[in-house]
Amino acid sequence: MTKYVCTVCGYVYDPEVGDPDNNINPGTSFQDIPEDWVCPLCGVGKDQFEEEA
C-alpha cells in the first residue's frame, strides 16, 4: 500500500500501521480515511499530504 507524507511536518501515514490513536485501523488506505482526519503531529488536513515518492 502507498504511504503518504505530510508536506508541513513530514509525518508519514503508513496504511499497514494506520493511526490507532485516532481510530484508523491498520490496513486502512489513505483514500479510506475520513475527510475530517488530521495529521496527528501538526493538525493539518488530508489535503496537505502527498503520495510518498
Curated annotation (Swiss-Prot):
- Give the UniProt keywords, A-Z: Electron transport, Iron, Metal-binding, Transport
Give start and end of each Rubredoxin-like domain: 1-53
* Cofactor(s) it depends on: Fe(3+)
Q: Does the keyword Zinc apply?
A: no
A Pfam family annotated for this UniProt entry: Rubredoxin
- Which parts of the sequence bind Fe cation? 6, 9, 39, 42
Q: Which family does it belong to?
A: Belongs to the rubredoxin family.
- State the protein's name: Rubredoxin
